[in-house]
Amino acid sequence: MHASKYIHPCTPQHALEVGFNLRSEDKREIEQTMGLAAPAAVLQSYYNSDISVYFTSPHGKAVGVAGVTTDNIIWMLCTDEGDNHPHTFVRESRRWVNSLDYPYLYNHVDMRNESHVKLLKLLRFKFINYYVHNGVPLITFIKPCANPSLWES
């Protein structure tokens, strides 16, 4: 897994910090799809993950948290700080996603969350299914991760 001066192992405290400071689009998405308050939803995502990371800005401020479950479900939730350093955030996100040792990654995103839809496109995820859940318009996305190390037994 890629680590850098902007990507760190996540802790429950990091998850709560981001949960209390989510972008409004991320907050709406998780509260409407998970039925939990934002901090609780972020903490649940953290505890359900096989791995999780904490992204920071060049100024050390929280940008977001992300993780992957044992079922290959990738997730990311962000603060507004990422909007202040978009190139750094996209570059580091790409490095992290491309370093993951999973055969594929998938999840869904609220179609109204334009920043994350754009980020997913930049990270080369493919959109494969549109549906509505709890009144939320969602898009399923997937990315095959052709990592040769996974083929060795």
Question: Which ranges hold each PLM region?
Answer:
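Conserved GNAT-fold acetyl-CoA-binding loop/helix
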Residues: 24-42
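A short helix-loop-beta-strand connector motif used in the catalytic cores of GNAT acetyltransferases and
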Residues: 42-55, 61
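A short, internal acetyl-CoA/4′-phosphopantetheine-binding micro-motif in the GNAT/acyltransferase core
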Residues: 75-91
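Conserved acyl-CoA
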Residues: 91-105, 123
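Conserved beta-strand-loop-alpha-helix junction that forms the acyl-donor binding cleft
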Residues: 105-121, 131-135
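C-terminal "cap" of GNAT-fold acetyltransferases
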Residues: 133-153
